[in-house]
Amino acid sequence: MPAKRLFGIISIIFLFVTCISCKSSTDLSEEKRILVIQSYEKHFPAYEKMKEIMSSDLRKKGIHASVYSFYLDCEQYSEKQQRQKLFKKLNELSTWTPDIILVNDDQALNALISSRHPLAKSIPVVFMGVSYPNIPIIRKYPNMMGFYDKPDYKRNIELIRRL
């Protein structure tokens, strides 16, 4: 995993942990419910490292958390199927309403937004690893924050020319 991407993941997890600790700084001993929406399948290589970093940061902050990870498996399902699958899962989680949603990669963010599920607008959402965000749409969600990996087109073109 490139150092820049790993630094970005660590930064967003720090932002995420800070958000969840600020959301309810009155009682950190209360268990927080965290929903993680991943774009790919469960065994995608980067996910294990991300879990380790998040668990470590939550422990350091003294935050007790119940983490539920949902995997869109975007390479197996169409965008419509991903959106429907996510909407159904969010409905199933209605008795376990998350305190915060962490979204990883473009497909997961797009599926959440396009699902139009009420939770997408009512709970804090932190996104990361997004390359092509739809900024005008994201601005309609005041509960969403995060970072995206802005493509360096000039550098990519130079690389293509060298190849």
Model-assigned labels for residue ranges:
Residues P2-I10, C22-L163:
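Short hydrophobic alpha-helices and adjacent helix-cap/hinge residues
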